[in-house]
Amino acid sequence: MLGKEWENTSFAEIGLLHQAPNDNDLEKFQHALTLMSEADNSSDLLIPLISDFLIWFYYQKTPLKWIPFLGHFFNTWQSCSFPPRRYLLAKILSGRISELLKVSPFELAASVTSQDVVEADSLVEENELQAWLEKQELVPSSSNFLNSFWISGGERELTEEEQNSLLQSNTTYTNSDLPASKQLESFISMNLSYSKVFFLHLLQHSDSSFNDKFLLLLANIPVTVSNVEVLLYLLQQEESLAQFDLNGKSFLYHMLVSLHNQVTNTSHLEKQRISTVATLFISKLFEIPSLSEYLSSTLFLDLQAFCIVALPQSAKLFQKVKALKNNP
């Protein structure tokens, strides 16, 4: 926990007193997520200053562009309305955070002026960082309404207030609101339960072009238990999605092709995992009458192709598919 007593301690001392985790990447990442959560849930405006600094402190030996939380720093800096925090983030992003090591969070908050912020902002290579983050698929290719939510939701669980603000929004989403593929995966990982409800909301409040591209992203998402859980929920709630036309082929067709490709283009160990999860997913789809009929008739050859490459994990499913085909 971040203590109020640190608010009058220099940033350099805070770094030493906090004792950064060992050089274990997972441990550092988890500590950083905890710090972000504390910052988000604190009513004390100085706590986010300490949190952001400590996240940087954990990764101070890592080149800026390779810090896992660069997207968090960058997006928070762009949207931050609290001058001291924006100033500190600008120093991090411009590689000048060492200039603040001798001051305390309280001193920083008390002394920063709007002109200081403007000058610090001018030293940030915003376009270069934006381009880098886009290339790494850590931010969408354009600034959009959902940008901060995709980024925040990929790093932590969204707060109840954030979740409700999205569900209560009357915005009609367009292509500029699409997430990058890796953001979509991270968002589901951090917000599994909410993703199910939110993605349905998106599909019901978006233009046709957004829906086409968003469904293609979902159809090609990597096979994990969490990801297929979301896909299953969407198809259970909106059975018509299975036959939603995407470039002349149905959503479920694209999904089967993706599953086939993921099974065939991976290592032996990964093939076993993907085959097991994907087979279970398809078996669950057969519990939905309309999808069972669609899979065993229109998509029979595509499903058969998947079952063949996913053997032996798909053996029972394959027998079931052939039986349905022969006895409709």
From Swiss-Prot:
GO terms for biological process: nuclear-transcribed mRNA poly(A) tail shortening. GO terms for cellular component: CCR4-NOT core complex; cytosol; nucleus. This is Uncharacterized protein C23H4.16c. It comes from Schizosaccharomyces pombe (strain 972 / ATCC 24843) (Fission yeast).
